[in-house]
Amino acid sequence: MKKILTSKLLTDFIESHIRNNKGFALSGGERRRLEIARSLVTDPSFILLDEPFAGIDPIAVEDIQGIINTLKNKNIGVLITDHNVRETLSITDRSYLLFNGQILKSGTSEFLANDKEAKRLYLGEKFRLD
């Protein structure tokens, strides 16, 4: 059964022309897709993505955002840690901003993007979601 699931995940996440490539030969976006596919082999209810938008080009960011939305629609919870706030807030239902090791603020993307304290301490005064 795992072999069938693994094969399906490879088909869903990895383009056929790179399936036999070694990990070091993959681009950043291709590596992220592979990391996500690997995390799904155990059929989890939640996955953790650590810095999924770091070091990838804008097209790959959109691709990974689409994958995350697909996972959400399949009722797979996704916990993201990332410093790329704009990319992360644009796809989250609820977010937590940490400051000095503590939760500074939590809420919807719109709430956080408009919160004066969040802007002053973390996001920057000119931060906007659009």
For each predicted feature, which ranges?
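Hydrophobic anchor residue at the start of the ABC signature
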Residues: 36
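Conserved catalytic motifs of ABC-family nucleotide-binding domains
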Residues: 43
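Conserved ABC ATPase "signature" region
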Residues: 1-18, 69, 117
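Helical segment within the ABC ATPase nucleotide-binding domain
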Residues: 62-74
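Catalytic Walker B motif of ABC-type/P-loop ATPase nucleotide-binding domains
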Residues: 47-51
